[in-house]
Amino acid sequence: YRLTYYTPDNQVSETDILAAFRMTPQPGVPAEECGAAVAAESSTGTWTTVWTDGLTQLDRDKGRCYDLEPVPGESNQYIAYVAYPIDLFEEGSVTNLLTSIVGNVFGFKALRALRLEDLRIPPAYSKTFWGPPHGIQVERDRLNKYGRPLLGCTIKPKLGLSAKNYGRAVYECLRGGLDFTKDDENVNSQSFMRWRDRFLFCAEAIYKAQTETGEVKGHYLNATAGTCEEMYKRASFAAQIGVPIIMHDYLTGGFTANTSLAMYCRDNGLLLHIHRAMHAVIDRQRNHGIHFRVLAKTLRMSGGDHLHSGTVVGKLEGEREVTLGFVDLMRDAYVEKDRSRGIYFTQDWCGMGGTMPVASGGIHVWHMPALTEIFGDDACLQFGGGTLGHPWGNAPGAAANRVASEACVQARNEGRDLSREGGDVIREACKWSPEL
């Protein structure tokens, strides 16, 4: 492979799709051979020379390993940089992009382990994608909420509630001060709560809470289903009853289904919340799999207005600088290369709308100062047990979160250092809020 696919003197084109792989060769296999094999097996190569190679423009179409970089502190690990010509990929298809780059090469026996760390999506390719159905600014305009993080809550217990009791829990949280409530990722249409009943009771809760508070409210109605046709039916019903947002589990549902649903949401005025259920199966191993920053980039291309991104401070794993790196890749129009945050390539999204990060998992009011400092305003902070676990009930739990959030935002705007004074800010707010 290395005679054809390892090209250290290669000049990368501005239209090439670039990939950074963390590569662990098998003992005795040269790194150059492994890097070339990755480039070959994820583009035009196969295990032997075939006569039909002569019928193609192989030098133009092949992937090329153009650089190898030893991983500091590891004896047999390398970052292999691979450039793929843009013509290898179908326009507007995340499915085809991932099928080509990661679909086959991970089983290559010359490799002990392989992890896709990052992708550079050139403007020439990113412009073939619609991106998020609406984006952060349009969502803020629809909600008429600015200058603070949005607040949400996942309804618990996740399974077992009747539709009416579920709707009651939604109402209590929304009237208490939250902006959103959420279906858990595995709430679809089970025997104890069919989807249509849940949608109707949640819509009633939303409208009642909006009337009482004067604020726009929403509930992430999970439209994920066993078939795309059923998913469209649920999304269509949500649009008919006038709710603002629905939800999809994009990894278990699939990228093709997600892109189709995002297009439906764009055409029908629905925001789309994305849950990353199953992500840790793919991204948790440090030496093998796909890093979440790649899954976040591909989701932004496929389409999603919200995406769960980890918390840094809660119960789920996430390193602060690395998490902030892919949060920027979700929200910002242009992100510079920064290896300290795990960003291997400069990424220019060329005006594609941003996806709002959602921090969820084991967080509560004492985390509010850190979350406000880390994520800023353009984020949704989801407190499940941190709302429903309040000793006075759901509405007081929601009120406590809202008071804590607004106190932290005000303190930040006054120039106070939340990393040092966050505890004092919460204690001061407690004097004026018995719920907190």
Swiss-Prot record:
Post-translational modification (record):
The disulfide bond which can form in the large chain dimeric partners within the hexadecamer appears to be associated with oxidative stress and protein turnover.
User: Which reactions are catalysed by this chain?
Assistant: 2 (2R)-3-phosphoglycerate + 2 H(+) = D-ribulose 1,5-bisphosphate + CO2 + H2O; D-ribulose 1,5-bisphosphate + O2 = 2-phosphoglycolate + (2R)-3-phosphoglycerate + 2 H(+)
Cofactor annotation remark: Binds 1 Mg(2+) ion per subunit.
Under CDD domains, the record lists: RuBisCO_large_I
* Required cofactor names: Mg(2+)
Q: Which UniProt keywords apply?
A: Calvin cycle, Carbon dioxide fixation, Chloroplast, Disulfide bond, Lyase, Magnesium, Metal-binding, Monooxygenase, Oxidoreductase, Photorespiration, Photosynthesis, Plastid
UniProt binding sites for substrate: 104, 154, 158, 276, 308, 360
E.C. numbers: 4.1.1.39
Which top-rank group of organisms is this from?
A: Eukaryota
InterPro entries for this protein: RuBisCO, RuBisCo_large_chain_AS, RuBisCO_lsu_C, RuBisCO_lsu_C_sf, RuBisCO_lsu_fd_N, RuBisCO_lsu_N_sf, RuBisCO_lsuI
Q: Which residues form the active site?
A: 156, 275
The UniProt annotation places Mg(2+) binding at: 182, 184-185
Transmembrane region(s): none
| N6-carboxylysine sites (modified residues) | 182
Name the Pfam families on file: RuBisCO_large, RuBisCO_large_N
**Where does the protein principally reside?**
plastid
Compartment annotation: Plastid, Chloroplast
Sorted alphabetically, which SUPFAM superfamilies does this protein's record hold? RuBisCo, C-terminal domain (SSF51649), RuBisCO, large subunit, small (N-terminal) domain (SSF54966)
Q: Name one GO biological process term.
A: photorespiration
GO molecular function annotation:
magnesium ion binding; monooxygenase activity; ribulose-bisphosphate carboxylase activity
GO cellular component annotations, sorted alphabetically?
chloroplast
What is annotated about its quaternary structure and interactions? Heterohexadecamer of 8 large chains and 8 small chains; disulfide-linked. The disulfide link is formed within the large subunit homodimers.
So what does this one do? Answer: RuBisCO catalyzes two reactions: the carboxylation of D-ribulose 1,5-bisphosphate, the primary event in carbon dioxide fixation, as well as the oxidative fragmentation of the pentose substrate in the photorespiration process. Both reactions occur simultaneously and in competition at the same active site.
Q: What else is known?
A: The basic functional RuBisCO is composed of a large chain homodimer in a 'head-to-tail' conformation. In form I RuBisCO this homodimer is arranged in a barrel-like tetramer with the small subunits forming a tetrameric 'cap' on each end of the 'barrel'.
Protein's name in the database: Ribulose bisphosphate carboxylase large chain
Protein's organism: Euglena geniculata
